[in-house]
Structures are given as structure tokens and as C-alpha cells.
Amino acid sequence: MKIKDLKMGDYFTLKPIAEPKESQVYVRGGYCKSDRKYDCNRFDDINACRRFPGDKEVFVDFVF
């Protein structure tokens, strides 16, 4: 699944992990028009923000 297909607030991981730790789970945020990327924060640390392009492949099939 691509990051642009997720809704704001959806959880995802960057690798296919069956039972990820809190530090491996990201929350999709809003879209930054100037960078043309999506803001995403780590679940356990809201200050750990990363921006990903819309075609970034992410994984949502995990138990959390």
C-alpha cells in the first residue's frame, strides 16, 4: 500500500513486521504542499517527524 492511500491518523510500518514495537510504528499526518510529501510521526515520539513521498510503500497488516 502507498502512503497516499492511507487516511490521516492511520498507523503503518516501513517494513513488513508482524508485531512491531511502538518505536517502529508511524502515524500518517497531513500533506506538506511546499515539499510535496506527507508528514509522519512515530507513535511513541511525536517529535520524531519524517516526511515521505506519496508513492512510498508502507505496510499496514500488523498486530499492535
Task: Label every PLM stretch briefly.
Residues 1-7:
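Mixed-charge, Lys/Arg-rich low-complexity intrinsically disordered regions
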Residues 9-11, 40:
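A broad helix-preferring feature
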Residues 21-34:
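Short beta-strand-centered aromatic/proline hotspots
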Residues 25, 39, 47-48:
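Intrinsically disordered, low-complexity regions enriched in serine, threonine, proline
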Residues 34-43:
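Short, solvent-exposed secondary-structure boundary/capping segments
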Residues 45-64:
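Intrinsically disordered, low-complexity, charged/polar segments
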